[in-house]
UniProtKB/Swiss-Prot annotation:
Residues 1-24 are annotated as: Disordered. SMART domains: Ribosomal_S15. This is Small ribosomal subunit protein uS15. Part of the 30S ribosomal subunit. Forms a bridge to the 50S subunit in the 70S ribosome, contacting the 23S rRNA. Transmembrane segments: none annotated. One of its GO terms (biological process) is translation. One of its GO terms (cellular component) is cytosolic small ribosomal subunit. GO terms for molecular function: rRNA binding; structural constituent of ribosome. It comes from the Bacteria. Belongs to the universal ribosomal protein uS15 family. Keywords: Ribonucleoprotein, Ribosomal protein, RNA-binding, rRNA-binding. The gene is rpsO.
């Protein structure tokens, strides 16, 4: 249930801040959002998969923490990221 290498590379390419950036909050949030979207499709057909649901909740909470951190550090970067990902924050 993970993303393939091409998808990850595309996300990193789109949200990175400099050519060697792979760990900025923007990249991490974008990767987590892609994994969350992937899992939401899985739950449409596997409603009783509680083990994966726990992992989903951990990812959602990790994304929330990263977004809170980004909001406290740089409000403009936070707004740009939320609008580009289409999150409800």
């Amino acid at each position: 249930m993970s993303l393939n290498a091409e998808t990850k590379a595309g996300i990193v390419e789109k949200y990175r801040r400099d050519p060697s950036d792979t760990g900025s909050p923007e990249v991490q949030v974008a990767l987590l959002s892609a994994r969350i979207d992937h899992l939401m499709g899985h739950f449409a057909s596997h409603k009783k998969d509680h083990h994966s649901r726990r992992g989903l909740l951990k990812m959602v909470n990790q994304r929330r923490k990263l977004l809170d951190y980004l909001k406290s550090q740089d409000q403009q970067r936070y707004q740009d990221l939320v609008s580009s990902l289409g999150l409800r924050r």
